[in-house]
């Protein structure tokens, strides 16, 4: 067994990050890799396609029931899923109460201290990326995750979140070993999406690892709480995830310290691609619409 690789999938909520990560990890386990998934998203949906179940009980929830995290055994919080993948969910507090990142910190420390990281080739963190607050940045900040893969699309907010996550990586890159592995574009069928993803990757100084095409088979598999790899292993989408897994596997040690851009540069890039209008164009369009309404 080689050196443990600690990777993380970051991305804005609703981008398909958990789906992408679970399908990729299912493909990695087919390649003979031993994997532990640590879900760090308050939705706690980072393992359901691997376990083929409803949401897994979280470390925080189980700790609250048991009295404290010290009262738990690893077997209580780690479940075994597809082809032996180990799964755990950190969890978070009730909405509006406390810091969701606290669960991430508690869970990772508990898992490490109790041997959950032994005998695996990969630990994969699935992390919410709209907010790179202290808690959610914890896998980066505490030098746990070494390679970050940002799941994004051609939509403006996904690009904005990707750039923000790159800023978070840059902040901790010099003090720790964290690097940006690259971007994964989840197709949303927006205009010039692949070009835009490649342009952002170039600005950030990283690779566009893979462009995952949109395919309804993903939703069909999700309804059965399965990855595409398990649901329809011979379909073209399963091959896309295998290709993505291969690229990540071969990307070891090739991460970069990113070069995030300013909001102005991001808006300029969107204007160049015709995604966003300039202030003058916008005002002109509003004036034309108002004139048409009066006519």
Swiss-Prot record:
Cofactor details (free text): Binds 1 [4Fe-4S] cluster per dimer.
According to the UniProt record, list the residues that bear ADP-ribosylarginine.
102
* Record note on modification: The reversible ADP-ribosylation of Arg-102 inactivates the nitrogenase reductase and regulates nitrogenase activity.
Provide this UniProt record's keywords sorted from A to Z.
4Fe-4S, ADP-ribosylation, ATP-binding, Iron, Iron-sulfur, Metal-binding, Nitrogen fixation, Nucleotide-binding, Oxidoreductase
Fetch the PROSITE patterns from UniProt: NIFH_FRXC_1, NIFH_FRXC_2, NIFH_FRXC_3
Asked whether the UniProt record includes 4Fe-4S among its keywords, one would answer: yes
Extract the InterPro entries matched here: NifH/chlL_CS (IPR030655), NifH/frxC (IPR000392), Nitrogenase_Fe_NifH (IPR005977), P-loop_NTPase (IPR027417)
UniProt-listed Enzyme Commission number(s) = 1.18.6.1
Specify which residues bind [4Fe-4S] cluster according to the UniProt entry for this protein: 99, 133
User: Does Cell inner membrane show up as a keyword for this record?
Assistant: no
Its name, as the record gives it, is Nitrogenase iron protein 1
- Source organism per UniProt: Rhodobacter capsulatus (strain ATCC BAA-309 / NBRC 16581 / SB1003)
- Organism taxonomic ancestry: Bacteria, Pseudomonadati, Pseudomonadota, Alphaproteobacteria, Rhodobacterales
Q: Its gene?
A: nifH
């Amino acid at each position: 067994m080689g050196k443990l690789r600690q990777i993380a999938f970051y991305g804005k909520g609703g981008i398909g990050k958990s789906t992408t990560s679970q399908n990729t990890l299912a493909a990695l386990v087919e390649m003979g890799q031993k994997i532990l998934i640590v879900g760090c998203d308050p939705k706690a949906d980072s393992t359901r396609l691997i376990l083929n179940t409803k949401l897994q009980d979280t470390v925080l929830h189980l700790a609250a029931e048991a009295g404290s995290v010290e009262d738990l055994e690893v077997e209580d919080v780690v479940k075994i899923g597809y082809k032996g993948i180990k799964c755990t969910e950190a969890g978070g507090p009730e909405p509006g109460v406390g810091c969701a990142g606290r669960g991430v910190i508690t869970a990772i420390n508990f898992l490490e201290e109790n041997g959950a990281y032994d005998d695996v080739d990969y630990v994969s963190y699935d992390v919410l990326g709209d907010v790179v607050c202290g808690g959610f940045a914890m896998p980066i900040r505490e030098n746990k995750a070494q390679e970050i893969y940002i799941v994004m699309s051609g939509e403006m907010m996904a690009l904005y979140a990707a750039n923000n996550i790159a800023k978070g990586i840059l902040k901790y890159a010099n003090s720790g070993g964290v690097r940006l592995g690259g971007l994964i574009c989840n197709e949303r069928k927006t205009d010039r999406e692949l070009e835009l993803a490649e342009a952002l990757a170039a600005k950030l100084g990283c690779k566009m690892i893979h462009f995952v095409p949109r395919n309804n088979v993903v939703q069909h598999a999700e309804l059965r709480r399965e990855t595409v790899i398990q649901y329809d292993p011979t379909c073209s989408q399963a091959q896309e995830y295998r290709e993505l897994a291969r690229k990540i596997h071969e990307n070891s040690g090739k991460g970069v310290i990113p070069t995030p851009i300013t909001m102005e540069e991001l808006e300029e890039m969107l204007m160049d691609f015709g995604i966003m209008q300039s202030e003058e164009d916008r005002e002109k369009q509003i004036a034309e619409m108002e004139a048409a309404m009066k006519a």
